[in-house]
Amino acid sequence: MNLRRKNRLWVVCAVLAGLGLTTALVLYALRANIDLFYTPGEILYGKRETQQLPAAGQRLRVGGMVMPGSVRRDPDSLKVNFSLYDAEGSVTVSYEGILPDLFREGQGVVVQGTLEKGNHVLAHEVLAKHDENYTPPEVEKAMQENHRRPQRADKDTSS
């Protein structure tokens, strides 16, 4: 092997090593920003495909319904404790802050936070789901004013 090919081989190896190191560093940096979505049942029994349980201390998002009768507010602060449930189980959630206006018992919510021991989620953010059928009053009024029924396709309009 001549000197020119040997130098080219070293350059290619250095570039590949640099790309590998860059990829590893990017993935390591993004690891802290990945929040996996779980339901309460998946926290208790694991993901359906892998049966993998989330670890205590893991950042995650949990989606479920607020269990009726479970909301407990601290009278001296903004702390709120409640339970999220689905068809397979429930988990407790603690949150300190102002809850969304649409938050209420029996309503769907998504909480983002950290899983603690005992299937307890320390939430940093609470997002309330709104009704997918909701239409603002202004839009509904405009739709009613501009609504025309389409003609039936099977009706003969030539006569």
UniProtKB/Swiss-Prot annotation:
Q: Fetch the InterPro entries from UniProt.
A: CcmE, CcmE-like_sf, NA-bd_OB-fold
Q: Which residues cross the membrane?
A: 9-29
Topological domains on the Periplasmic side lie at: 30-159
Subcellular location, in the record's words?
Answer: Cell inner membrane
Q: Which UniProt keywords apply?
A: Cell inner membrane, Cell membrane, Cytochrome c-type biogenesis, Heme, Iron, Membrane, Metal-binding, Signal-anchor, Transmembrane, Transmembrane helix
- Which annotated residues bind heme? H130, Y134
User: Out of the domains of life, which is the source?
Assistant: Bacteria
Segments in the Cytoplasmic topological domain: 1-8
Q: Supply one GO CC term from the record.
A: plasma membrane
Region listing for Disordered, in residue ranges = 129-159
Recorded GO MF terms: heme binding; metal ion binding
Membrane topology value: Single-pass type II membrane protein
A GO biological-process term: cytochrome complex assembly
Q: Which family does it belong to?
A: Belongs to the CcmE/CycJ family.
The free-text function statement in the UniProt record for this protein reads: Heme chaperone required for the biogenesis of c-type cytochromes. Transiently binds heme delivered by CcmC and transfers the heme to apo-cytochromes in a process facilitated by CcmF and CcmH.
Q: What is this protein called?
A: Cytochrome c-type biogenesis protein CcmE
What is the source species?
Salmonella typhimurium (strain LT2 / SGSC1412 / ATCC 700720)
